[in-house]
Amino acid sequence: MEKEDLDLLGGHIAEFIDNPDEIVSYRRVPTQHADIVAYQRMRSAFNHMTVMFKKDMVLKAGNYEDGLYMEDDLLWLNMIAAGAKTGNLDQILCKVRVGAGMFERRGGLRYLKLYRQARQRMLERGQISYMEYAKSVAIQAIVALCPGFVRQFIFVKLLRKRK
């Protein structure tokens, strides 16, 4: 691995609905450690399915913790807080299906409650500021409480790149 000094490494993904040859969007993430640290405070700076990490750093950071739907984000922030060096390759590493089920799972009162609880943990640990907490929960409330087709539009058309 070229990036041997990194503890946590991922990359970009291409998203499709039914046909892997018909890409509908791309989820590009920051590639440099400083940009990743800043981005991670509001949104996940890693595409989970592309991630590899060093086991010793995961254990040093406390391993995965309970946080339904947010385990990865909590782990990434805990690893950064424990001193992990991070990076993302500036490459599409895999294609990912993003059907209606994904958009349905990211909505509703239960999802919003779990999201708020995880963000509250991050706030209490000093991993995010109160303003970042308030802004992210307010935005997520709007997204979580809108109909699934609106959420799909937000994710595919507004939060992702077309090329």
Where in the sequence are the language-model features?
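Conserved nucleotide-sugar donor-binding
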Residues: 47-61
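Catalytic beta-strand/loop signature of glycosyltransferases that borders the donor
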Residues: 11-12, 86-93
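Acidic donor-binding loop at a coil-to-helix junction in glycosyltransferase catalytic cores
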Residues: 69-77
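Terminal low-complexity segments of carbohydrate-biosynthetic enzymes
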Residues: 140-163
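Short, flexible, basic/aromatic active-site loop/helix in glycosyltransferases
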Residues: 12, 26-44, 59
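Catalytic core of nucleotide-sugar-dependent glycosyltransferases
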Residues: 84, 96, 104-129
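Short, well-ordered alpha-helical scaffold segment located
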Residues: 15, 56-60, 92-95, 102
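Conserved donor NDP-sugar-binding/catalytic core segment of glycosyltransferases
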Residues: 1-25
